[in-house]
Amino acid sequence: MQTVLSDQHQLHFPKGELAGGQLVRPYECPERWDYIVRRLDQVGLSDRIEPTALDLSLVEQVHTPAFLQFLSEAWDQWSAEGFDGEAIPTVFPARRMQQREPKYIDGRLGYYAMAMETAITSGTWEAAQSSAAVAQTAQNLVSDGASSAFALCRPPGHHAGADLYGGYCFLNNAAIAATGFLNRGAERVAVLDVDFHHGNGTQDIFYQRDDVMFLSLHGAPEDAFPHFLGYTDETGARQGEGFNVNYPLPPGTLYAEWFKALQDALKKIAAYSPDALVISLGVDTFKNDPISFFKLESDDFSDYGKAIAELNMPTLFVMEGGYAVEEIGINTVNVLTGFLDG
């Protein structure tokens, strides 16, 4: 299995995140990438390549032109106002307010953001494009005949909607990869999101389509970010009715219960019979993750990697979350080695 990665991820390095009423060091940090690379080397998965140039036309199939323009100019507009800190939204278009994009940067940030924890810095746009290029390049490896590949994306992407950023995400790498598979001849693609947090952005992008099935195992939205999507009655709309499947699970969920949901998802994927499978790989289901509440052990990640392999489908792993930094390498690579041994 080849890994695609880029050290340009370091260009996105926010210094602060609002959590618990305090400004803290962001949980989504460059060290996450370092620990994963180190563990890949330790187990011998050292076949790595840099991404090719990003095909922006592919990104434009996933995100709206206005949103992409905003991301490309947000930092320059913010800094032109003389602000010294990172660009963080402070006002949002709440219920019964106009859904019109303002001109002033503070309003634009709130218009496109879903939460306050995700800062834009001087290098965010470049890092987000590089992360998308990592996903695109890995997708092309699989489209060209590789049985599997790992896109070590940072920043992550599954919370980014067609015109929405937040949850540490700017461009939806998994959705870009799924769209790339379709462009390369796939008739159907499944996206399985095993991150602790619901992949609201991916659901948003494909909700009315039947050529991409989206399935997500996540903390119940009553208790877990992003709170406002991820319920079982969200099953798709129009042409996409029946092709969106959510598995919200309660606080304290152990692996046995989580794995039952995974088995059901895998059965649905097998019945759908996609030409390619994208795994939104978040390992924040780990018991010691600081912003999650599932109880998976490190060995459990190996076990479910094997279960995914039993589908025997061309499979692309796209890195998402995981914030127990010292264990992120072990847990991520356990999924990959479990898959390869399956």
Predicted regions and their residues:
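HDAC/HDAC-like amidohydrolase catalytic core signature
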Residues: 1-192, 197-342
